[in-house]
């Protein structure tokens, strides 16, 4: 968020003495951006002696008193400045974001790559760990969830800290402790500001026999292609006409 702070100090002398009392008034104007300018929120804060007493939040749409001190100001500002303050969402926040002063890093969006892997060789009904690797995303804000057969899993879920890559993108690993059963479908669900819709990657549990049958089928197809090619080659050679008789001189 971009923050502007205005501080005003006043130090009136105390009657009958030389000591001074200091009063600090602060104003903070804050702009919050989600996915570029897709969603913008503007917040104005009024603070007196380190205590916020009045606030305007664009999500609320009007000035609200935070303490009793701000009640009269809230009524006055809502009558005199409300429309102008509401317009600052575009005239200040959006304008500054799209202007030349906006850092490139604020506008940068990199979509994550998502891959699921199993920590150990699959064995049904045995304890195992699924790892959802989410890499190369920016900005850092991201939400990764696990689902089993459409239901969110919250038990047995753990995550690494965000890891910063050399190009300023990030990566994170989110693990799920589980004991897979045949037919179960596990889904890694990823939400990120760079995405219009979440990324979902599925992993399906299958028995060793099913895996062996699948590998055998793939191997059979490969061998079939090899033998087919060999048969076509032999047929091609056999279709060539017989060679003519050798010259008479050679027969003698």
UniProtKB/Swiss-Prot annotation:
One of its GO terms (cellular component) is multivesicular body. It is found in: Membrane. Ubiquitinated in immature dendritic cells leading to down-regulation of MHC class II. Residues 17-109 are annotated as: Beta-1. Its main location: membrane. The keyword Transmembrane helix applies. Residues 204-213 are annotated as: Connecting peptide. Residues 112-200 form the Ig-like C1-type domain. InterPro entries: Ig-like_dom, Ig-like_dom_sf, Ig-like_fold, Ig/MHC_CS, Ig_C1-set, MHC/Immunoglobulin, MHC_I/II-like_Ag-recog, MHC_II_a/b_N. This is H-2 class II histocompatibility antigen, A-F beta chain. The lineage of its organism: Eukaryota, Metazoa, Chordata, Craniata, Vertebrata. The gene is H2-Ab1.
């Amino acid at each position: 968020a971009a923050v502007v702070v205005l501080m005003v100090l006043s130090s009136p002398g105390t009657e009958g003495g030389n000591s001074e009392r200091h009063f600090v008034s602060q104003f903070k104007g804050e702009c919050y951006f989600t996915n570029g300018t897709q969603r913008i929120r503007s917040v104005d804060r009024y603070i007196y002696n380190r205590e916020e007493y009045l606030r305007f939040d664009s999500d609320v749409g009007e000035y609200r008193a935070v303490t009793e001190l701000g009640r009269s100001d809230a009524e006055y500002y809502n009558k005199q400045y409300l429309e102008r303050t509401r317009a600052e969402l575009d005239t200040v926040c959006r304008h500054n974001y799209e202007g030349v002063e906006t850092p490139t890093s604020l506008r940068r969006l990199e979509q994550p790559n998502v891959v699921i892997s199993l920590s150990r060789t699959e064995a049904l009904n045995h304890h195992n760990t699924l790892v959802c690797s989410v890499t190369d995303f920016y900005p850092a804000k991201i939400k990764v969830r696990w689902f089993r057969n459409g239901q969110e899993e919250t038990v047995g879920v753990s995550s690494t800290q965000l890891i910063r890559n050399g190009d300023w993108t990030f990566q994170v690993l989110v693990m799920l402790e589980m004991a897979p059963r045949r037919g179960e479908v596990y889904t890694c669900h990823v939400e990120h500001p760079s995405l219009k819709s979440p990324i979902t990657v599925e992993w399906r549990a299958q028995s060793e026999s099913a895996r062996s049958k699948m590998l055998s089928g793939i191997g059979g197809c490969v061998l079939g292609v090899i033998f087919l090619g060999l048969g076509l080659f032999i047929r091609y050679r056999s279709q060539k006409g017989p060679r003519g008789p050798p010259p008479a001189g050679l027969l003698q």
